[in-house]
Curated annotation (Swiss-Prot):
Regions that span the bilayer: none
Region (Disordered) location: 221-287
GO terms of biological process kind: translation
Lineage: Bacteria, Bacillati, Cyanobacteriota, Cyanophyceae, Synechococcales
Entry's family note: Belongs to the universal ribosomal protein uL2 family.
UniProt biased composition (Basic residues): 258-287
Assembly: Part of the 50S ribosomal subunit. Forms a bridge to the 30S subunit in the 70S ribosome.
Protein name in UniProt: Large ribosomal subunit protein uL2
Amino acid sequence: MAIRNFRPYTPGTRTRVVTDFSEVTGRKPERSLVVSKHRRKGRNNRGVITCRHRGGGHKRLYRVVDFRRNKHGITAKVAAIHYDPHRNARLALLFYADGEKRYILAPAGVQVGQTVVSGPDAPIENGNAMPLSAVPLGSSVHCVELYAGRGGQMVRTAGASAQVMAKEGDYVALKLPSTEVRLVRRECYATLGEVGNSEVRNTSLGKAGRRRWLGRRPQVRGSVMNPCDHPHGGGEGRAPIGRSGPVTPWGKPALGLKTRKRNKPSNRYVLRKRRKTSKRSRGGRDS
């Protein structure tokens, strides 16, 4: 897989960078694994906006993805690599030996025609799923379960992988993409390898219209609003926000405020907290 650059024929193509979709082999999704899904557009059950800047975009059909990998011991053949409009990762269409079809997240390096299998006795190969107790130390895994049998909940985005650091007792230490080291039960399943389509981090939309196609509406700075709409609003001309630090539209501190509870029960499983990715001062860009 590679990325594709464009010549500046128009302002929208000047900075446009996209993936070339060379790894995608299937044109249409498997009809038995596609369902319709109502788009919430950032609203809750009462119709109130709970997530701003959402709405519009191209219509989508949801692909049912198998995050559990619970067909143990049954080999499956990779029939095609499909595009998924709901995520950056690609999907691998599996044809199982018993005739069932399922989608999984396409691991990096998995090719059409390759066979994968899940279970505690699965071989150590990319795309195979097994308990963390059977994964060798230092291996990269993705689609990691937090609770056994619930399905993969962590490390599912394109290009992501976690590293098995240590095993002790009933737990396995994983180094997550955020650099956090966390304990996970040894019976939880994970898939070997990293998620494919890692080059997506190098892409650029190029124009505002492509962001609208994805269902993202414009973000307006609070400093250009009226005081009735945002705490940063008001003043004459380009006035400062008039506060010691930026706040949300509802007056709560923004940009750097930790929202995780100090006494959260799962803190006991975090061996090392994630490192900070940026050092923004409290006088940074307002929300």
